């Protein structure tokens, strides 16, 4: 069996959206995701490096801006959602970036027919357990801060969007 050059170069996605692209993990994934998509659309509210060639787009977006997120997700095949505040802050800050922002990501996915989202959760979802206690998939969540609570909400939102709209989250 032979593989033609065009099929050998085929990538699973035409365009991937990466939120939180200015963060530590986001900066690493900007380059790594290019092996999986023809174009990586990198987004963050913070300043980012310029596009690294024709296979990358850089777009600034505040996840609390519903219309902005809807426009940001237009034309993408899947979303890698790392965006938001990654440390404990005042609830009002967490609300806009992490809770409303994650809702806006899933709504944009639904409205644009995007059926795959990668959502980064956190160990803070189970942070009130003693560190030496073993947990399994059935252990109740016990968020230890507003940030952990926002990630717990994101997990529930992902489950809701799967059952209601068929959007898969990993």
Model-derived features: positions:
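NAD(P)-cofactor binding segment of oxidoreductase domains
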Residues: 79, 90-117
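Conserved glycine-rich Rossmann-like NAD(P)H-binding loop of the short-chain dehydrogenase/reductase
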Residues: 36-49
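NAD(P)H-binding glycine-rich loop region in Rossmannoid oxidoreductase-like domains
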Residues: 63-97
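N-terminal Rossmann NAD(P)H-binding glycine-rich loop of SDR-like oxidoreductase domains
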Residues: 12-36
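Catalytic helix-loop patch of NAD(P)-dependent Rossmann-fold dehydrogenases
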Residues: 96, 130-169
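Conserved Rossmann-fold NAD(P)-dependent oxidoreductase catalytic core, especially the SDR/UDP-sugar
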Residues: 104-145
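SDR active-site strand-loop-helix element
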Residues: 19, 43, 79-82, 117-123
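Rossmann-fold cofactor-recognition segment
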Residues: 53-65
């Amino acid at each position: 069996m032979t593989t033609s050059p065009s099929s050998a170069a085929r990538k699973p996605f035409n365009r991937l959206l990466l939120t939180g692209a200015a963060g530590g993990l986001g900066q690493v994934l900007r380059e790594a995701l290019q092996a999986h998509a023809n174009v990586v659309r990198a987004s963050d509210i913070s300043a980012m490096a310029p596009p690294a060639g024709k296979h990358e787009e850089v777009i600034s977006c505040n996840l609390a801006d519903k219309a902005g997120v809807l426009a940001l997700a237009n034309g993408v095949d899947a979303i890698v959602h790392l965006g938001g505040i990654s440390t404990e802050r005042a609830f009002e800050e967490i609300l806009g970036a992490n809770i409303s922002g994650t809702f806006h990501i899933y709504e944009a996915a639904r409205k644009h027919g995007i059926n795959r989202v990668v959502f980064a959760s956190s160990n803070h979802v189970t942070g009130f357990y003693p560190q030496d206690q073993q947990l399994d998939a059935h252990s109740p969540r016990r968020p230890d801060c507003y940030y952990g609570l926002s990630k717990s909400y994101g997990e529930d939102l992902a489950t809701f969007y799967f059952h209601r709209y068929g959007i898969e989250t990993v």
